[in-house]
Every structure is written in structure tokens, then in C-alpha cells.
Amino acid sequence: MTASTEGQARYGQSVKGLLTEKVSTCGADVIALTKQVLKGSHSSELLGQAARNMVMQEDSILHSEDSLRKMAIITTHLQYQQEAIQKNVEQSSNLQDQLKHLLK
């Protein structure tokens, strides 16, 4: 081989080596980019799921608040009924006393 042929061969090998290195680097960059895109996609899926869960929880909270309001109304009505029963028991006791007094 002549010096120029040998120089061209070395230059070709050098260029080939640089190209191989650049292709490897680009391949690694593409893999890293793909992983990042997938991670971002997964993150957006998680955020979407979190948003759906929050909406479901909000509905549950609203339903619970409604149930608590209804229970408060029922409690108030039960208190009125308890007071009425207590008043009737007192009146019944008074009537019994009056009957005993009349029957003596």
C-alpha cells in the first residue's frame, strides 16, 4: 500500500469510528427521549386518574353532607317526638294521681 492509500484507509476507519460513535450516541439519546416521553405519558395518566378519584371523592363528600343534613332533620324530629312522649307520660301520671284521688 502506498502512503496515500494507507492514509485514506486510516481516514476511512477514523470516519467510520466517528460515525459509529455518533450513531450509538444518537441511539442512546433516542432511547432516553423515548423513556422520558413514556414517563411523561404515565405521569399524565396518573394525573388523570387522580383527577377522576378527586371527582369521585367530591361526589361522596357531597352525598355524605346531604346524608348528614337528613340525619340532623331526623334527629330534630325524634327530639320533638321524645318531648311529646315525655309530656304525655307526665300528663298520664297526673291523670293517675287525679283518678286515685277521686276514687278514695
Curated annotation (Swiss-Prot):
InterPro entries linked to this entry: BORCS7
Keyword NADP: no
Superkingdom to which the source organism belongs: Eukaryota
Main location group: membrane
Keywords for the protein's UniProt record, in alphabetical order: Lysosome, Membrane
GO cellular component terms, semicolon-separated: BORC complex; lysosomal membrane
Keyword Cytoplasm attributed: no
Compartments, record wording: Lysosome membrane
Function: As part of a BORC-like complex may play a role in lysosomes movement and localization at the cell periphery. Associated with the cytosolic face of lysosomes, this complex may couple lysosomes to microtubule plus-end-directed kinesin motor.
Family: Belongs to the BORCS7 family.
Protein's name in the database: BLOC-1-related complex subunit 7
